[in-house]
Every structure is written in structure tokens, then in C-alpha cells.
Amino acid sequence: ASRGRVGGGALEESLPALHSLRVLSWDRGDCVAVPPQAVRAVLAAARRRGGTVVVDLPRRLDEGVGEVLAQLDLALLVVPAELRAVAAAGRIAAAVGMAVRDLRVAVRGPYAPGLDDREVARLLGLPLAGEVPVEPGLLRPRGGGRPPGASGRGPLARFCTGFWERALVESGGAR
């Protein structure tokens, strides 16, 4: 296996940009595993550029995902408010919780009967980061290449703004 260092500038320039957000996506297939060394090099390059690095992880846990988890300051598990989803999230939370010191849950509506955001957090034994309400704009095709929440209005934008403000206060400043 080869080893090397990824340059932060080269990484940034190679990624697509959308409204000043650089995106490197995880493969959603079941057969591609990213070696931990590659994950480590890419995360190190992203961190060297400064600012916050947001990682959207797949549902499966492998060595590459484990490398990401080991480097996280905070993990947010987004869980639909449905019984089957909560049960599946419980298994994921148990595994992720062993690698991440600050794991929180964000609950996505609509809610199944008898469930609300606090009940989901209680069932998972995780601190509640907040509720992610249904975002009507995500249910229809988007034109113009604007990402969800780009207008700064709407349920997703409000959740992200509130979560980010709380995270900055808790961490002691800007990231």
C-alpha cells in the first residue's frame, strides 16, 4: 500500500464547490471500502486548510469510517422518528459511541404515534441536538443548483443555524 500526504490546497481545488462549500462525498454502495490511511490523509489535508470539516458518513461501519469517527470532535446521528429507524439507530449509536466522545441525536419528523424528539433521545440514551422538521423543498426537484437551506430560511436552515450557534458556544469560539 502506498502512503503519502494530500495537500490541503490541492484537495480543495479538486473538489466541486457549491456556494463556497466544498463537497467530498462518501460512496453509498456496499462494496467500496476506503483504506484508513487514505481517510487519515484526506482528513488531515482538510483540517490543515482550517475551519470546520463536516463528514456525512455511510450507514455501514468499516475501518475507513472508524478512522473518521476516531477524529471527530462531535457526531450527530440523524434519526427518522419511526420505531424501526430508532431500533436501527440504537445499534449504530452503540458502535459509534465507543469511538466518539460527543455523540448526539437529531430527530427528523414526521413522528410516528407515541414518539417525539425527546422520547427518541431517551430511547437511544443520547443528548438531543434538536429536531429536524420536514423540509418541503427537499420533496420536490430543485432547480438552479442551490443546496437545501441556502436561503437561510426554512426548517433545515433554522436547525443548522441553531445547532451551529450552540456548538460554537460549547467549543469556546469560532471554528
Predicted regions, residues:
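P-loop/Walker-type NTP enzyme "switch/lid" segment
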Residues: 1-51, 138-144, 148-150
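Intrinsic-disorder/low-complexity, polar/charged segments
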Residues: 7-9, 68, 82, 154
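Conserved catalytic-core segment of NTP-binding enzymes
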Residues: 38-141
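NTP-binding/hydrolysis catalytic cores, primarily Walker-type P-loop NTPases
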Residues: 144-175
